[in-house]
Amino acid sequence: MFNFFAAAPKGFEYALAKELETLGAENVRESVAGVYFSASLAQGYQITLWTRLASRIVLILFTGECQSAEQLYNAAYTIDWPSHFSNRSTFSIDFHGTGGFINNSQFGALKIKDAVVDRFRDDDLSRPDVVKGHPDMRIDAHYGRGKITIGINFSGAALHQRGYRGNTGEAPLKENLAANMLYRSGWADNPVTLLDPFCGSGTVLIEAALMACDIAPGLMRERFGFEHWRRHDQALWQQVIEEAKARASLGKTRCQLKFYGSDIDSRVVALAKRNANSAGVFDFIDFKVANALNLEPPVAEGMVLTNPPYGERLGNVTSLLQLYFQLGEKFKQSYGGWKLGLLCSDMELVSSLKLKADKQMKMYNGALECAFNLYTLHATSTRRDIPVDTTGQGGEIAAPFANRLKKNLKQLEKWAKREGIDSYRLYDADIPEYNVAVDRYLDYVVVQEYAAPSAIPEAVTKRRLTDVLLALPRALGIDPDKIVLKTRERQKGTNQYQKLDGEKLELVTTEYGCSFKLNLTDYLDTGLFLDHRLTRKLVGEKAKNRDVLNLFAYTGSASVHAGKGGAKSVTTVDMSNTYLNWAKDNFMLNGLIGRQYQFEQADCLQWIRDCERQFDLIFIDPPTFSNSKRMEDSFDVQRDHVDLLASLKKLLRPGGEIVFSNNKRKFKMDMEALAAAGLKAVNIDDKVLPMDYARNPQIHNCWVVTHG
């Protein structure tokens, strides 16, 4: 008997142990990311050829304590390497694990390499060559918890590489993961008609057909690791191969099952057909190009087993949520009596199915942790176009939110047209349970999620946000691809809600005759603060024949209004070169070209101290708080506003005005200190609060400051 280790991804251990027992393994013991077992040489060959789950099979030659580099070397040296492979064979070492005296796997591999080479030399043999590419012999070592296990990679290249895929690059779904889905779903024990509506290159269906036809997954492989092992029994191996071929031939004649696969992409369907043909199961699988949402079940009962798109495989999160929701509706409407097994890495997407799982399991697709959920599908008469409420109270998904949104849209759409604007706020946490802001930018909608109170469970906030995104397209009559989601807190884990496929989404919006460039995806803000719309307009109305200064200018939108309003000159100052370039683009959009328009990159507070010019109109919208590394001092608008305005006094000509705005809630102007500085201020909040922000009057405050 020989001792082996079958390595596999995490989450495979239970199914792999059962498979190994079925294949005749003895002393089967589950471990992390693999299973230990004992087997005869014939059984070892059989398992290597037939395992559908293992990534590699290692023939163990040594296991023992290892607390130092010397012990590691000695452990490797005790193995009689010349009895296992020739000095004319090339070899490599795959070392797994770190800790203790082993800081990195390369150090462990070098120690074992030294021991192997020395063992050959001490046996009066020339040393074998080490190669990285395709060695004749792979030595496998694993270190953990003070123990070292050294062996020979019995199987060779990764076993999930069956040989039917060809050189098509990295697959979204590895073959052994597809096999594990088949095992854990119960399909392998009770084969039924199988459908994959997102079949991609056909992996799930091909693996299922190989099982149904009793075809060993290793039959298509050209090489195995044991072929250069000196104790390899070629006659015995050939016998195992011939038996497998006979079983495959018989299995294909007996298989009565039919498999169905579809994908919306004709190119991957063509690839799936080629792969199925290479695997010898083309005749058992019906592939076609189709949209999963329009696909009807081919028979009355069966199983859907699939890995739908998620994350970067499709793009916009709202489109994904809608896809999963509509998929759940399709399953409920058309697939009553079927079973469903679904693999996905994003639980928000899974929850959008609105299906109750019978069982939930964890699997890994490479390094990506995924949920594998099993469902029993029951027929319903739910209308496809009305999302189902998750509150248990009936009606639409997020019905209060959807109704409020429709009401706001009806009021604001006509108003915006009269005002000559096409970007405005539709919803601002009007209903506390749906704690988001919804802004319309032409045909697009940006959703900003506010951080929820700590008392509300994260699962609740995630569900509500998901429901908001599901309700939006229908409530506003827009395509899901037109919705962009932003969050006001740091992204965690596998959350994909940041960009649309990593591509810029730029638009041009108009506002009271001015045009502005927007970027809806690359930054937390879009380039235009909608709540300052009337403040910008006011700056434009006050700018005629005046020298205007815009500080903390962001993308220069107030400067554009000043230029369009007939300013004699406009000076735009901001610390960010990115935003200054954006401001220049906005000036170009509006035909504002000339030396009278100046752009200066600087710490605004320092710039004020250094400036020797004077202006007739100054617009300043400082941050509520800043401690940027590029600024010499920290800034707090409540603490420092008087000093700030006093420093601007020397820049303000007699008869000039400062339009001072900030977004600090409960801000209090220190009128006494301001008067002592020779200035006076008049609050104009009621004049510059736009209608679309009337629900939130504390969004910002605004003052006109003049010489006292």
Curated annotation (Swiss-Prot):
Cellular compartment(s): Cytoplasm
GO MF term list: 23S rRNA (guanine(2445)-N(2))-methyltransferase activity; RNA binding; rRNA (guanine-N7-)-methyltransferase activity
Listed EC numbers: 2.1.1.173, 2.1.1.264
Enzyme category, top tier: transferase
Keyword Transferase: yes
Keyword vocabulary terms for this entry: Cytoplasm, Methyltransferase, RNA-binding, rRNA processing, S-adenosyl-L-methionine, Transferase
Cellular component per GO, a single term: cytoplasm
Reactions listed under catalytic activity: guanosine(2445) in 23S rRNA + S-adenosyl-L-methionine = N(2)-methylguanosine(2445) in 23S rRNA + S-adenosyl-L-homocysteine + H(+); guanosine(2069) in 23S rRNA + S-adenosyl-L-methionine = N(2)-methylguanosine(2069) in 23S rRNA + S-adenosyl-L-homocysteine + H(+)
Boundaries of every THUMP domain copy: 43-154
InterPro entries, per the entry: 23SrRNA_methyltr_KL (IPR017244), DNA_methylase_N6_adenine_CS (IPR002052), RlmKL-like_Mtase (IPR000241), RlmKL-like_Mtase_CS (IPR053943), RlmL_1st (IPR054170), SAM-dep_methyl-trfase (IPR019614), SAM-dependent_MTases_sf (IPR029063), THUMP_dom (IPR004114)
Similarity section: Belongs to the methyltransferase superfamily. RlmKL family.
The protein's role, per its UniProt record: Specifically methylates the guanine in position 2445 (m2G2445) and the guanine in position 2069 (m7G2069) of 23S rRNA.
Cross-referenced PANTHER family: RIBOSOMAL RNA LARGE SUBUNIT METHYLTRANSFERASE K/L, RIBOSOMAL RNA LARGE SUBUNIT METHYLTRANSFERASE K_L
NCBIfam families, per the entry: PRK11783.1 (NF008748)
Name assigned to this protein: Ribosomal RNA large subunit methyltransferase K/L
Gene: rlmL
